[in-house]
Each structure stands twice: as C-alpha cells, then as structure tokens.
Amino acid sequence: MAALSSAAVSVPSFAAATPMRSSRSSRMVVRASLGKKAASAAVAMAAGAMLLGGSAMAQDVLLGANGGVLVFEPNDFSVKAGETITFKNNAGYPHNVVFDEDAVPSGVDVSKISQEEYLTAPGETFSVTLTVPGTYGFYCEPHAGAGMVGKVTVN
C-alpha cells in the first residue's frame, strides 16, 4: 500500500494575465443582467406587498384647501378600523381637529382622539388611529362657523 507523505498544490496567479474577449454575445449578457434585475424587482415588490399587507393604510386630510378656503379636504371619507388618519396644516392658519362627543360611537373618549392644540405652521400634522367602527363627526374649533367640519366613517 502506498502512503502519501506530502502534497503540493499550485495556485495560478492572475496578476499578469492579459484580458480575453468573451466569445459570448453582449446581447446575451444584457439579457441575463436584465433578467436578474427583473427577478430582483419582483422579489422587492413581493416583500413590499407583504409588509403592506400587515400594516394599515393611511388617509391624509388637509386642514384648509389650496387657495385659503377653510375646509377639511376631503371632508367626508371612510377608513377601515385601525387605519391612520393624518391631518396636515395646508396654509398656516391656526387649525385643530376636535371630535364631537355627540357625533362619535358610544364609548369613544373624544379627549383621546382630538387635537385641541392649534397646528399653526404649514406642514404641521396630527395623526389619529380610530379602531371603533361607526361615524365620527369632527370640526376645527376656530373655523367651524365658516363650515370647517368633517365626517369619517370607520368600517
């Protein structure tokens, strides 16, 4: 029986290698890389869809319309229970969002969902998540008399 007492491994060096042209068509290389990009995009989209599937969507509401009109925009909308509603001061007038205690589902504490402090700067926001199904009436305290009132239906 023969025994191996030592072995040598030779690793070639590529430091002095000269570039070789590939015999593959550049069109094939482009197609292959586009295929990889498409596959990566599909994976990213699927991952995004899974993330969105587990989280609630959002509803944005402007406090004041473009042009300075004192309204909620939109002023009548629906959301699913657990979706976030973000109210955004659009023009810089002082606005707030007060839920009317006589116009919300029974048992809802309006002090926990209202923003009674004024949002005074353009871009300031207030977000609320409503979880009890029903209809909620809300208004802007300083501008309710001018018609700045709204309604959200939670399904």
From Swiss-Prot:
Names of required cofactors: Cu(2+)
Effect seen on changing residue 120 to N: In strain: cv. NK 1558
Predominant subcellular localization, coarse grouping: plastid
Stored InterPro entries: BlueCu_1, BlueCu_1_BS, Copper_blue_Plastocyanin, Cupredoxin, Plastocyanin
Nucleotide-binding recorded as keyword: no
CDD domains for the chain: Plastocyanin
Family membership: Belongs to the plastocyanin family.
Protein name: Plastocyanin, chloroplastic
Protein source organism: Hordeum vulgare (Barley)
